[in-house]
Amino acid sequence: MAQDCITIKGTRGGLLILLDASRDFNEIKANLAAKFAAARGFFRGAAFALVPTSPLNSQETAELEAICREHGLVPGNNITLPSRRRPGGNQAAHPDPVALTSTGLPTLLDEGNLRNGQEINYPGHVMWLGDVHQGATIRAGGNILIMGTLKGNAHAGSQGDRSAAIVAYRMEPEQLGIAGIIARSPEQKTRHPYPEIARLVGTRIVIDPYLSPKSSRN
């Protein structure tokens, strides 16, 4: 499968949208629009800057900026890529948060595959672009959005927020937690070929298809 031509990175100032300008421009546009559509408004309100691997002409830049604006992003200034490291130990490094105006908490945006023994702890929302493998854990004070497969552990609302939710493209977790309520995956896991959302209903964690931001709580 061809490598993604778009990479989105979070910084203190906003989102850096890294573009592989060697790819077909129509492919770049389609990939960018697909990423925003899949995020379902998660980026809305964030500042952005385009970072192509080689210069774009003014028409190409305008078309890509238009796609970003259509999904609620706003052009930003002085957005720079933070220095990053991912140590071999258990704690995975993360960049500075992206503040989204549509939420009361900052958002951590990062990408990659979280491996067995690695753990992300963050007081705000976490958006992970990649898979979370068995034995890996994400803990967030707010919501967790995994744009990949969740096979490890995800704990949202870690400071007691009962309205927090966990969304994954493929929901196959070892363990889910929301506001201290824990649910463990059954031995016979049912795999569904669509995104799902886990929320707290009473004292139970309920998983529904993620059809829209207003998908049923029942």
Swiss-Prot record:
Keyword terms of this UniProt record: Cell cycle, Cell division, Septation
GO terms (BP aspect): cell morphogenesis; division septum assembly; regulation of cell division; regulation of cell septum assembly
Entry keyword annotation includes Cell cycle: yes
Alphabetical list of SUPFAM superfamilies matching this protein: Cell-division inhibitor MinC, C-terminal domain
Signal sequence segment: none
Stated family: Belongs to the MinC family.
NCBIfam families (UniProt xref): minC (TIGR01222)
Function: Cell division inhibitor that blocks the formation of polar Z ring septums. Rapidly oscillates between the poles of the cell to destabilize FtsZ filaments that have formed before they mature into polar Z rings. Prevents FtsZ polymerization.
Subunit text: Interacts with MinD and FtsZ.
Protein name, UniProt field: Probable septum site-determining protein MinC
Organism: Moorella thermoacetica (strain ATCC 39073 / JCM 9320)
